[in-house]
Structure formats: C-alpha cells, structure tokens
Amino acid sequence: MKMADAKQKRNEQLKRWIGSETDLEPPVVKRQKTKVKFDDGAVFLAACSSGDTDEVLKLLHRGADINYANVDGLTALHQACIDDNVDMVKFLVENGANINQPDNEGWIPLHAAASCGYLDIAEFLIGQGAHVGAVNSEGDTPLDIAEEEAMEELLQNEVNRQGVDIEAARKEEERVMLRDARQWLNSGHISDVRHAKSGGTALHVAAAKGYTEVLKLLIQAGYDVNIKDYDGWTPLHAAAHWGKEEACRILVDNLCDMETVNKVGQTAFDVADEDILGYLEELQKKQTLLHSEKRDKKSPLIESTANMENNQPQKAFKNKETLIIEPEKNASRIESLEHEKADEEEEGKKDESSCSSEEDEEDDSESEAETDKTKPMASVSNAHTSSTQAAPAAVTAPTLSSNQGTPTSPVKKFPISTTKISPKEEERKDESPASWRLGLRKTGSYGALAEISASKEAQKEKDTAGVMRSASSPRLSSSLDNKEKEKDNKGTRLAYVTPTIPRRLASTSDIEEKENRESSSLRTSSSYTRRKWEDDLKKNSSINEGSTYHRSCSFGRRQDDLISCSVPSTTSTPTVTSAAGLQRSLPSSTSTAAKTPPGSSSAGTQSSTSNRLWAEDSTEKEKDSAPTAVTIPVAPTVVNAAAPSTTTLTTTTAGTVSEVRERRRSYLTPVRDEESESQRKARSRQARQSRRSTQGVTLTDLQEAEKTIGRSRSTRTREQENEEKEKEEKEKQDKEKQEEKKESEASREDEYKQKYSRTYDETYTRYRPVSTSSSSAPSSSSLSTLGSTLYASSQLNRPNSLVGITSAYSRGLAKENEREGEKKEEEKEGEDKSQPKSIRERRRPREKRRSTGVSFWTQDSDENEQERQSDTEDGSSKRETQTDSVSRYDSSSTSSSDRYDSLLGRSASYSYLEDRKPYSSRLEKDDSTDFKKLYEQILAENEKLKAQLHDTNMELTDLKLQLEKATQRQERFADRSQLEMEKRERRALERRISEMEEELKMLPDLKADNQRLKDENGALIRVISKLSK
C-alpha cells in the first residue's frame, strides 16, 4: 500500500518536471572561458614587488608605465624602497623611474628610505639627484622624519653641501600659490586647474594648509567660497578637517555655506578636527548674526549724496589696488566711473582734505612700502543708480609691484557667478562700520562744500528717505562685539578726559547720533527742514559763497530745526540770541571756525547757524517775556546788550516754541557714567591743567546742575517760583546781617572763607545777572559785561566735545533769578531736615568727589555784586569794549568761543553750587560753636573707622593663617597620593616590559612567516597573470 503511494507521488513529480525551466535547459553544459584581467599597472607593480626583473622588462617593452601609482599614490620605486630591495631600486632608476615623484601624502622615495632607515638606498637616491629639501603634505623634509642618527647625519651633510634652505623649502608651495593668486587678481582671470584625481582647487589647498594670505587673495579675485571637489568637499570641509582655525574664520566671514554636505552627507562639522569643533560652532553663531544684520541693512555701505560733489573725493587706499565692483552692476557703471575719475581728480586739487584710509586685513604684509602712494580714485555715486539700488561698496585688492599700474587704472571686472555679489564685498558689508567709517571723517578744510545745489539736496533727501548722514559724521551701529556700546560710552567720557581737540567737523555728533536713534519721529521732519534750510541759505549766497558750512544731518537733528527753517534769514550779519541759544549752537561754529582756511572769511560759516540761534532765542523769549534778543557782528560769541532794534529776524509762534521746548527737555537729560577712582583723579588733573585761576565750575558741576534744574523746574509752578523770589530777597537780608555779626566775631573764619571762595565768588559776581526786580534791561547789560570781560581773560582751549556737552546743560541763563530762588528754598528745607530724600542722596556722592575747594557766600561778594551792577548800567563803555573784542575774534575764533561757552556754563550753574556746598559752608548761618560740634563728630567718626580698620586687619591675618594651614594640608595629601600613583605606574610599566620581551621572542618567527607569505603571493600573482594571457 505504501509502495503504491510512493510511486504515485513520484509520477506527480515527473509530471511537474516536464516543461519546467530546468527541463528546457540543453543537455550539454556551455563551457565559457572565464578570464581574470588585471590592470597593466597592477601587474607591473606585482612584478616589481616580487623582484622579477625579466618580467618587469617584458612589461616595460609592452608599454607599461614605470611611474604607475596605486590608489595611495605609491609607485614601484616607493615600494622597492619600503621593501629594502636595493637591486630593484637601481633597476627602476636606471630604466627611467621618476626619482622625486610624490605619493598622495607628498612623500618621495627618499622620504620612505629615510623613514625606514635604509642608508644604502638613501645614498643611492641622493647620488641620482633625489631632492633632499622635498616637503610632504605635513611640511616635513626627509631629514625631519629620519629616526636613526646615521641617516640624520647623512641627510644633514647633504643639505649643508647643497646649501638647501629648509625653511624656504617649506614655504615654497605657499610662495608659488601666492604668486599665482596675485597674477590672477591682476589679470582679472582665474586660470586654475582642478586636481586630476580629487578635483581639488587652489582654494581647497589654501584652506587645508592654512595659507591665509593666498586664501584672502583668491576670495578677493572672485573664487566661489562654496566650490566643491569630486567628493563634494568645500574649502570649509578641508580647513575644518585639518584644523585650520584662521582659514575657517576667513571662509565664514565671507559667508560660506556651513551646512553644505559632501557626497556622503557630511557637513564640515562631521569631518572637523575635534580641537576646533567649538570654534566652528562659535563661527556659526557669528555668521547667523552677520546674515541677520545683512538682511536688516537696507541702506548702502557708503552712503553717498546726490553726486558726491558736496563731499571730498574718495581717496585711494594705501596699497596698490584695483576697484572691484558688484558683478551684476559692472556693465552699467564702468563708463560713469571713468568719467567721474577726471572730474574728481580736478576737485581733489581744489579740496585738500583727505580721507584716512583703512588697510584691509589681507594686505598688511605688503602695505608698508606703499603708505605714501595715496591718490584720488574713482568714487561710486548714487546719481547713476535707481533710488532703490544700494551704492556698491569699493573693495580693495593688492597687486604685485611688477604689475603695478597707476591707482586710477581702468576698473577690472571678474567673471564670478551670475547673481552673487563678490564674496569680499559681502565680508566688507558685514564688518562693523566703526573701523572703516573712521576713514570717512573730514580732517581738513571744507572748501568743496560750497558747491552743493538745492536740486542735489532734494535728490539726496529722496535717496536717503530722511535719515541722511554726511560722510563726516560717524555712524554708530551695533556689531558683534558691542562696538556700539563702547562707542556710546566713549562719546560720553570724552567730556571728562579728552586732552586734545578732535580734528573733525561736528565733535558732538556721536552724542547727537545716540539721541537721534531714540526718536524716529524726529528724523522724517529733519530731512524736510534741512532741505528748506538749505534753500534759505541759497538766498543769502552773497554771504555764504566763501565757505558755507553745511551741517550734517546727524548734528543737531532735532525738532527745533522746525523753528529754524520757518524763520527766513534776511540779515547781512549772523544773529545771536539768548545765552542758551548761543551755547546750543557753539560746537558747530567753533569747529568750523577753527578749520577755515586762512584766506577765507568766517562770516559765511557763522551765518549758517543764525537760524538755529534765533530759534533758541525765540524759545527763551516766549518763556521769559524779557528782551534778550541781541545782535552780534561776525561772531556768535559777544552779546550786545539792549539793542533789539537792529535785528531783522522774525519770531515764531509761542505754541510751536513751547511744544519744541517740552520735546527737547524729554530726551536731553544727561546720563552720568559711574567713575572709578583713577578716572576721577585723571579728570580732576586735566581740569586743573586746562582752566584759569578764576574758573571754579567744572563740567561735572554743569551736568549735576542741569539734572537738578530739570527736576525742580518740572515739579514747580509759576506761583511757587514767584513766592520763592520774595523769600530769596528776605533771606539775602537775613544772611547779610548774620555775616556782619560773624565778621566781627570770627575774623579768622572770614579769612579762611575768602581764601577758598574767591575763585567762585569773583566769577559769580562778575557774570551773574541781577535779581528779578530789574529783569529787563539790567539782564542784557550783564550779558554785555560778560562779553567784554570774556576776551580779557587768558585763552582756554577746551575740546569741542566738552563744548558740545556743556552747551546742552547751560541753556537757562535768562532764568537765573528763578533758579536762585529755588536753590535758596532747597537750602532752607535741607537745614530743617524736610528736604526730599532724593536731593540729599544726590548731594552725598558729589561732596565725596569735590576737589576744587569750598565755596562760600560772603558779605564782600554781595557788595561787589551791587557795585558791578551799577557799573554795567553804563552801556556805552561796555559796547566799546565789545567792538574791541569783535575785532579780536578773527584771530582767536576757536579759543574765544570755547571760553564764552565755559563761562556761560559756570554762570548758569552757580546757583547749583550753593545747593552743593559742604557742611562748613551751610553752617555759617548758625553759631560758630557748630564748628566745634562738627569737628567732634568727625573726630568720633575717625576713631570709629580706625577701630573697624584694626578689626578688619586682625580678621585678615587670621584668614591668612588658616589659608596657609589648609594649603600645607592639601600639599601633604597630594604628595602621598602622588607617591602611590608613581608606584602603580611603575608596576604597570614593568608588566608591560615583560610582555614586550615575550613578543620580541616571537618576532623572528613572524618575520619568517611574513617572508614565506610574500613569496607565495608573488608566485600566485605570476601564475594568475600567465593564465590571463
């Protein structure tokens, strides 16, 4: 039964078999001849390796390449040197093998022989002309990698005999690349050839080997920073892989793509050396910031005006250079640039002012010889571009001295990628403006400024959309390392310690710029008012033709320009106003007057400020209703009292004035930096050196006074001020009585006071306006006294930056009486212990820092003041003195302006000094016994402080002793643990030595096995090659 079932299954299998693919196969198996065909080069290398010279000769006769290299770049000669096969080395060299052919790592056969220590092969190779100065990829010569002394001696002797400069040999490749890069840059054509195997470019090589100079030149010549080799590696991959930090930084600064992947999906971070991974991450953050900053920047890098005619021509940089323009704009601009060159060279002869040029980083090594070769160069203008197009940045590039043309040689253009800006320009755009912007500040005369026209101003306002900076104003911009913050701080601190006058047009523009950035609503109005102001100036062209000062928009760009532009100027002489207005505009007038060429008149310069001065004056007039408007011939530094009939200016409405005053006050509150002790000492020393014997008020006093005045004025009403004026008169009478008593009782105290307070009292009584009872004519007459006394004093050259800051704080001379009342009231309240806490807190730090002596009121000062007032009513004599001073203005414009500025600042802030006096000054209203009490208090405080100091010293010594004990304990523990560590290490090393000795015994057996396997391998290869024929 089972047999039947088996047969049935078998039959079914046979049925399924019939017609299957296997059944359809032919019965005779096809015999295909299988051949293993090796590359001729591989066969040749195998034959050489086996030492079969006959086989090698046959292969050479059949056309084999004797210099064939395997995947690692090793040739038969390399292999023979490694195998110590002297016969094969001689055979190959005799048959024409290249004795200096490098492998993939740059090793020539001599490197291999030196590394292995085969003296006979090395001697033979040197005898046949091998290069002992050959350098591999890591910069090593055969001498560097030789390990045996005999080999080192052989190679050293040969180096000495041939006179090879090893250091020069190491830098040979970089020198050649540098030469080629310069050549490409000068010719405007990059003729680079990719590596045959890897597809690497010169940029890859420079990045991988850290040739930073070559890298910069290649990028400048227009190389794509994201170019890839055959494996998809960019230059950043190469630089990161070989750990070249500087090369990575240059590539990132030129906005290379840090996320690019190679053929196997690796970014530069994946292939980077571990040591620079953190640095790469920092660079990535930096590049992200650069990208975001670039997106935010809508304005051009160099903001040019309508046709650059109202500015000096841009000068050449210090190196031999060419101008690189954005490629997509080249065609449309080259002609215009050529035309402009001739015009601006002529203009450059008239205008001797020059731009201080910034040297590019990459040109530092070559720039020393060319520092004196700055000549006019083509400047890029906005006039030939649409309003939405950014003016191109001028990018500099060094040239070889052998290929040097004139600096105004035709502009080269480079074939770069279609729509990209050249990478160097990208780098320049993203650099912080603080460094290169310095090159845009004017440092000399400004004669060329007079050539501007109203139509060009209109075009300029259109192009810059109301926020326009002239080339002479610094630009404060946020950068990666907080340069804005440093700049702002620097601009503020200049007021304290600046020793010299900065040579630039608007010295206060740094501070003004900071304020302007905070008020965007004022910017748009400034562009309109400035254009209108320029049109008004054109009407006065008979005066202004000589040297009109066109104020940059960053200087004084405030709402009060609205007033100045709405007042038509019809005077033939510049008009000045109240002290506040004059003080406000002095920085511009003094800086321009100082820089006017000797032959030109300063009248036009000063008249350009008259509108702003009148605006300030009208502000003060509306506030005080006192006739303080006066005239000044030629210079805005001397005030002619009580002569409003000679002015021809019209005032603006009171509504606009008050609105402007409120707006200005809101953002002019001074911010004081915290000072260290050393800074304070330096500032005090500078102040002492630069002031006269009668100058008692420093810049710090002015700043503190303005703070207090601003706060008190905002909180007090008119009614309170009137009450305080009455109180002030009563207090004066009381004080005079007290002082008379004190004079008889305490003569020694009076002498002390007179000795230390004269510097303050003389200045104050000489320049202070009279009290409110005679606030109209006498106030003007005291101003004339100020003007006449001003020029008799010695010259005081304060820096313009100090003047600019002082001007903002001393605007309230016309309301001196009100402020006196306020200060007296505050003193009284302070003595009753009812004054606000904030005022007391403000006093304390000031008292600690006072270094200019003690200020007192005396009976003599008040009597002198009355005598002064009676003297100043004689107007004719003072006016004579004034005209005398005016004639002197031409020769001392800068110093007199500064002097007037400082005197106004002191008189305006004197009342604040009353509030700031130390205890001894305020106690003179009390009995003389208070001095004894004060002395006892100070004595007790000193004793207390001494006791505290003693306790602190004791604690300090205890702590030092504890620290020494702890240190010694730690040292003992460290020594013990170190001994144990050394013992463990020694045991481990001994075990290791014994293991090595065992392995050393097995070494001969391994060598024998290795040789046998080599022989078998060679035999197999020969058999296979014969079979394949």
UniProtKB/Swiss-Prot annotation:
SMART domains: ANK. Residues 357-369 have a biased composition (Acidic residues). This is Protein phosphatase 1 regulatory subunit 12A. Heterotetramerization is mediated by the interaction between a coiled-coil of PRKG1 and the leucine/isoleucine zipper of PPP1R12A/MBS, the myosin-binding subunit of the myosin phosphatase. The KVKF motif mediates interaction with PPP1CB. A motif (KVKF motif) lies at residues 35-38. It comes from Mus musculus (Mouse). Residues 385-402, 469-480, 564-578, 596-610, 626-656, 771-786, 883-897 have a biased composition (Low complexity). It is found in: Cytoplasm; Cytoplasm, Cytoskeleton, Stress fiber. Signal peptide: none annotated. The modification (3S)-3-hydroxyasparagine is found at residues 67, 100, 226. Residues 681-691, 840-851 have a biased composition (Basic residues). Residues 302-314, 540-551, 585-594 have a biased composition (Polar residues). Phosphorylated by CIT (Rho-associated kinase). Phosphorylated cooperatively by ROCK1 and CDC42BP on Thr-694. Phosphorylated on upon DNA damage, probably by ATM or ATR. In vitro, phosphorylation of Ser-693 by PKA and PKG appears to prevent phosphorylation of the inhibitory site Thr-694, probably mediated by PRKG1. Phosphorylation at Ser-445, Ser-472 and Ser-909 by NUAK1 promotes interaction with 14-3-3, leading to inhibit interaction with myosin light chain MLC2, preventing dephosphorylation of MLC2. May be phosphorylated at Thr-694 by DMPK; may inhibit the myosin phosphatase activity. The modification Phosphotyrosine is found at residue 446. Expressed in striated and vascular smooth muscle, specificcally in type 2a fibers (at protein level). Expression levels are 20-30% higher in developed males than females (at protein level). Pfam families: Ank_2, PRKG1_interact.
